[in-house]
A protein has these predicted regions:
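Acidic/His- and Gly-rich active-site-bordering loop/insert found
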Residues: 1-94, 113-118, 357
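Metal-dependent amide/peptide-bond hydrolase catalytic core
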Residues: 185-399
Length: 399
């Protein structure tokens, strides 16, 4: 609950990093605050082993999905103030993913307190800038520097491991795969003219042209999702924002307009495959409308990722889960973005497993509408699974 009480929106993770570093240092870990950018440190702590064993990295992001003071978000699950009720913790970051970080921290504290000696090192890293945000147009600065900013810095500035466990919310399921994401901007031009003459022959309304493109994208999206079904899930296409015209001067014909599309991708897809599909839609609309092809740019390309389920990290996590819970965990694919993409790309095979993701009965079936919350019982389960997995992995010696 202490972590939830520390506000840590993207770009303002410093206080959370300081808290995590203090806890790790108190437990006897060798700690450092790794400055990613001014005022944005990753918090890293290592419990060194005797040497010669496999090294394990627990990791998770410290930034939260929201600031906690948005007027359009009400309820205790959207605020940086923890509330405990009926065995559940409610508050911003409770599920995504301070609960996972807390469970990993408790597992390391237990190993350190018991004086357990392992051949391998165990590291815990709380990272900045994971939330799905990206700079575009006037939206610039640290607040928009998400999508793996901290994890990429962590990996490329000296933190290594044989395997990683990412404590993202998975409802206590072992995940070996993650969808990727592309954010695209599609823009059209129009005629600068007074609105009173907007219907003159030859005048083009950019918003009307965007409307035709939007209709075509909505027609294309279901087929895209079906063609790329993977591990029982289908990647979504979401028209997430639209912009055009002069809101302060409606007496002017819209001479520019854009729509912004979130396209989820699955392992095996490449960004240029998606670009070709989108351009085919735009070219078809241009031909039907006898207009120039709309401009298409990508400003996020977060690739999908997939690990062989037979890799030791996945098998060990499944075994640990079964030993703790008595139930099997078949590998699943996660739909939202996650930093496992970056660890896998840098040859640190990363399993994803965390206590968040379950919904309290008060929340119905959709946490994003009710606010974040997590079961303490599920946190205890995750901490035990992390402990068992760490003991197994860090006791192994490479062949």
């Amino acid at each position: 609950m202490e972590m939830v009480d520390i506000a840590s929106p993207t770009g303002s993770e410093k206080d959370m990093a300081a808290y995590l570093e203090r806890r790790m240092s108190r437990a006897g870990l060798k700690t450092t605050l790794q400055e990613v950018s001014a005022g944005r440190p990753n918090a890293v702590g290592t419990l060194h082993g005797t040497g010669g064993g496999r090294n394990l990295l627990f990791t998770g992001h410290m930034d939260t999905s929201y600031d906690g003071d948005e007027e359009f978000l009400t309820g205790e699950g959207f605020k940086a103030k923890a509330v405990f009720r009926d065995g559940w913790i409610w508050g911003l970051g409770a599920s995504n993913m301070k609960s996972g970080l807390a469970c990993a921290l408790v597992a390391l504290e237990a190993i350190a307190e018991e004086g357990i000696s392992l051949p391998g090192d165990i590291t815990l890293a709380g990272v900045v800038g994971e939330i799905e945000k990206a700079p575009i147009e006037e939206f610039q600065g640290e607040y928009f520097a998400g999508y793996g900013t901290g994890s990429r810095y962590l990996i490329t500035h000296g933190i290594t491991a044989d395997y990683a466990i990412l404590a993202e919310p998975t409802s206590l399921q072992v995940s070996n795969a993650n969808m990727g994401c592309i954010w695209a901007r599609i823009s059209t031009g129009g005629t600068m003219a007074h609105s009173a003459y907007g219907k003159n022959p030859g005048h083009v309304n950019a918003i009307e042209e965007i409307h035709h493109i939007q209709t075509a994208l909505l027609d294309w999206a279901p087929g895209y999702s079906e063609r790329h079904a993977f591990m029982g899930e289908r990647p979504s296409v979401t028209i997430a924002a639209v912009q055009g015209g002069l809101r302060w001067r409606l007496s002017r014909n819209p001479f520019e307009a854009s729509l912004y599309v979130d396209v989820r991708t699955v392992p095996g897809q490449k960004a240029d495959d998606v670009k070709r599909e989108l351009r085919a839609v735009l070219q078809r609309v241009a031909g039907e409308r006898n207009m120039p092809e709309a401009e298409l740019i990508f400003y996020v390309n977060d690739p999908p990722t997939l690990l062989d389920p037979e890799l030791p990290i996945i098998k060990t996590m499944r075994t640990a889960h079964e030993e703790v819970t008595g139930t099997a965990s078949e590998p699943v694919i996660r739909l939202p973005a996650a930093d496992s993409t970056h660890f896998n790309r840098y040859d640190i095979p990363c399993a994803v497993y965390g206590p968040g993701g379950f919904n309290h009965s008060d929340a119905g079936t959709w946490m994003h509408a009710a606010g974040e919350h997590v079961s303490v019982e599920n946190m205890l389960t995750a901490a035990r699974v992390y402990l068992v997995a760490a003991l197994k992995i860090c006791s192994q010696r490479p062949a």
